[in-house]
UniProtKB/Swiss-Prot annotation:
InterPro entries: Ribosomal_bL28, Ribosomal_bL28/bL31-like_sf, Ribosomal_bL28_bact-type, Ribosomal_bL28_sf. This is Large ribosomal subunit protein bL28. Gene3D superfamilies: Ribosomal protein L28/L24. Keywords: Ribonucleoprotein, Ribosomal protein. One of its GO terms (cellular component) is ribosome. One of its GO terms (molecular function) is structural constituent of ribosome. One of its GO terms (biological process) is translation. The gene is rpmB. Belongs to the bacterial ribosomal protein bL28 family.
Length: 78
């Protein structure tokens, strides 16, 4: 299973680790993914998704249905 957010599509970022002597080596910055069961009010059921903590924070603010609508996601297929 790839480390990708089910709702936002966030994935790993390629970055550099810089030492004290400024030697740069490649580093993979993974997304902070969490496995969560979210209640979908319109569908009257739980949805099991793998989401980033940033997405969870946005869902708490806006709501699951409005976030999915803004991202163009059909929750009945998740």
């Amino acid at each position: 299973m790839s480390r990708v957010c089910d709702l936002s599509g966030t994935r790993a970022n390629n970055g550099m680790a810089v030492s004290h002597s400024h030697i740069r080596t490649k580093k993979l910055q993974q997304a902070n993914l969490q496995q969560r069961k979210l209640w979908w009010e319109e569908g009257k059921k739980w949805i099991k998704v793998r989401v980033t903590t940033r997405t969870l924070k946005t869902i708490q603010k806006k709501g699951l249905n409005s976030y999915a609508k803004a991202m163009g996601i059909d929750l009945s297929k998740v």
